[in-house]
Swiss-Prot record:
Function, in words: This protein is one of the early assembly proteins of the 50S ribosomal subunit, although it is not seen to bind rRNA by itself. It is important during the early stages of 50S assembly.
One GO MF term attached to the UniProt entry: structural constituent of ribosome
SUPFAM superfamilies attached to this UniProt entry: Ribosomal protein L13
Membrane-crossing residue ranges in chain numbering: none
Statement: the UniProt record of this protein carries the keyword Protease: no
This protein's record includes keyword Hydrolase: no
Subunit comment: Part of the 50S ribosomal subunit.
A Pfam family recorded for this sequence: Ribosomal_L13
Protein name per Swiss-Prot or TrEMBL: Large ribosomal subunit protein uL13
Annotated keywords: Ribonucleoprotein, Ribosomal protein
Family: Belongs to the universal ribosomal protein uL13 family.
Any one GO biological process: negative regulation of translation
PANTHER family: LARGE RIBOSOMAL SUBUNIT PROTEIN UL13M (PTHR11545:SF2), RIBOSOMAL PROTEIN L13 (PTHR11545)
Length: 149
């Protein structure tokens, strides 16, 4: 007789997921390509234990968010729309203003759009840490440097 094979699909359990810490330097990186890779790692799709309904992803620390690269004329032309739900409450935030005031928000907005918009997505988003400068307070977690192509 041959060995018996198990044809059961593996499903990760929340307690048995091992999480790693990665650090990404955003200096000169293209926003969309970097955000797609960050969303993939936050979701856990780079692991063989990926389970769609369980948080199997890792932590990501992004540094130098103020030096992010945008292709084309997006620095001058791109803007983010929001509304307060009050009459006349339309607000546009332009990218060149956000790069000066809150450069972290640009990366966070791009990654948030690539994550699921449900409870799992909110849980995944909490594992993203973005900092405008090169320093971050997560050195004690020993993050591994991650290259984004």
């Amino acid at each position: 007789m041959s060995k018996s094979l198990s044809f059961k699909t593996y499903s990760a359990k929340p307690g048995e997921v091992e999480r790693s810490w990665y650090v990404i330097d955003a200096d000169g990186q293209v926003l969309g390509r970097m955000a797609a890779e960050i969303a993939r790692v936050l979701r856990g799709k780079h692991k063989p234990q990926f389970t769609p309904h369980i948080d199997t992803g890792d932590f990501i620390v992004v540094t130098n968010a103020a030096k992010i690269g945008l292709s084309g004329k997006k620095t001058e032309q791109k803007s983010y729309f929001s509304h307060s739900n009050y009459p006349g409450g339309v607000k546009f935030d332009h990218v060149k203003d956000l790069l000066k005031k809150k450069p972290e928000k640009i990366i966070e907005h791009a990654v948030w759009g690539m994550l699921p918009h449900n409870n799992l997505g909110r849980q995944l988003f909490k594992k993203l840490k973005v900092y405008a400068g090169p320093e971050h307070p997560h050195a004690s977690q020993n993050p591994v440097e991650m290259k984004v192509n």
